[in-house]
Amino acid sequence: MSKNTVALDVDYVKSQFPAFKDPKSSKWSFFENAGGSYVPINVIDHLNHFMTSTKVQPYAEFDTSAIAGDNMDQATALFAEMINAKTDEIIIGGSTTMNMYVLSNAMRSLLKPGDEVIVTNQDHEANVGAWRRLAEHGMVIKEWQINANTAELEIDDLKSLLSNKTKIVAVTHCSNIVGSINDLKAIAKLVHEYDAYIVGDGVSYAPHGFPDVKD
């Protein structure tokens, strides 16, 4: 074991999750974090405190509201720190599906009929359906397909799809379908050469990989 490797104390980690004390779930391992996960006791305690103490309209002129606002600001700052972003670059929403739908509608004003949007068949529906709906407004949707033998997205296949009409490329950072981790930095570099936007779905990667959005 190298000096930079830290052993994971699995027993300690599991002890932080009340679900593993329940006979119905104690012998299971849960990997579908994107679809919903059990949470550790400290998260449960924070949620309980929110529901019983600070579930009010934030940023108003009374003490509980001020505390609620401070808690929201702190949460935003922590998310920003995790991915090396500025706090004004962070928006907390209800779900990735909803956030992508809002984003696609917001970006629609930047597009015109005939502009091209590239999606993949490796992505979760959240980062596909919202962009496919732009076809209703005259945008051309292209699909970057996986290699049928490896289930990987090949960068050369993306090159063949990109054109001077490409405006958006939507791609997952880590596929929860096949487990691939895509080289988002290399993909972004290529997409930016066409003066296009890249939209990365980090749901399956960010909780484990701590991406640096400034890198």
Listing of model-derived features with the role each one plays in the protein:
Residues 1-215:
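Pyridoxal 5′-phosphate
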